[in-house]
């Protein structure tokens, strides 16, 4: 049972819209919601875009928590949405000029929102990128992490806090791809030279240990298959092509 009604009403609540896409991850979503009352700063709007086959059930005590702090809780249920499409819906429905983005696979520190919001304000920047650390304790997940994400936190879209007007410059997310739409959007922001602040806090991704090596590799190749369609990934494909070509030439002449 999640106990939200004991949270005091003097919590720091700011005009920020938190956007969370969720698909068939109700337990993970509830785990994320459990964290919110402990945050140093709490958004006054929480938008959950649920694209599961069955509607998620939000605990009554969480609804009471949002009412006690005058937080608007908006649950949008629409099936078969890719993450980019779900985020676009959240952006269009949000009422605030500052947007924060999370997903059900990453969990922030309690100071994440407070720190990012103040970095934007103090640096007069358009946003703060997410910074995600991929946890790995099992041997197979350490090997996979070493070959992919690395052992240090990396820049990610989940965890980003942005001025809403940035989407007038960079556009919205591509809605027709299963993965890679966030990287595509981040590349557009870099192309437009949007002023962003480096984050002080990081998020934790803890799903590597719960999957087998076969599952991790399968998911990785599935995501890269979808990402390969996007323009920003062209450079990656070129690196692979020239690298493989070089190896082929060396093998042929030895």
Predicted feature locations:
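Short, acidic, metal-binding catalytic loop of nucleotide-sugar glycosyltransferases
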Residues: 34-43
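A conserved acidic beta->alpha catalytic loop
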Residues: 35, 50-60, 106-107
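Short beta-strand/loop segment that forms part of the nucleotide-sugar
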Residues: 44-54, 76-79
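Glycine-rich, basic loop-to-helix element that forms the pyrophosphate-binding segment
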Residues: 78-94
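Short aromatic/hydrophobic "clamp" motif used to bind/position activated sugar donors
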Residues: 99
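A recurrent flexible, glycine/aromatic-enriched loop bordering the glycosyltransferase active site
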Residues: 134, 145-162, 178, 204, ...
């Amino acid at each position: 049972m999640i106990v939200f009604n004991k949270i005091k009403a003097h919590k720091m609540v700011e005009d920020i819209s938190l956007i969370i896409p969720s698909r068939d991850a109700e337990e993970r979503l509830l785990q994320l919601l459990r964290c919110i009352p402990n945050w140093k700063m709490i958004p006054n709007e929480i938008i959950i875009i649920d694209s599961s086959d069955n509607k998620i059930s939000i605990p009554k005590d969480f609804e009471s928590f949002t009412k006690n702090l005058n937080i608007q809780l908006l649950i949008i249920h629409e099936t078969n949405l890719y993450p980019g499409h779900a985020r676009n819906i959240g952006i269009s429905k949000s009422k605030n000029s500052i947007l924060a983005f999370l997903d059900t696979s990453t969990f922030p520190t309690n100071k994440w929102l407070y720190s990012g919001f103040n970095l934007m304000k103090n640096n007069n920047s358009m946003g703060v990128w997410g910074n995600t650390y991929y946890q790995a304790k099992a041997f197979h997940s350490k090997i996979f992490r070493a070959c992919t994400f690395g052992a240090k936190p990396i820049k990610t879209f989940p965890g980003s806090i942005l001025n809403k007007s940035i989407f007038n410059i960079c556009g919205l997310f591509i809605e027709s791809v299963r993965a890679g739409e966030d990287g595509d959007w981040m590349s557009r922001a870099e192309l437009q030279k949007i002023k962003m602040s480096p984050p002080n806090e990081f998020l934790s991704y803890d799903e590597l240990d719960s999957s087998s090596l076969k599952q991790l590799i399968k998911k990785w190749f599935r995501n890269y298959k979808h990402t390969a369609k996007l323009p920003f990934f062209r450079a990656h494909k070129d690196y692979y092509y020239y690298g493989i070509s070089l190896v082929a030439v060396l093998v042929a002449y030895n």
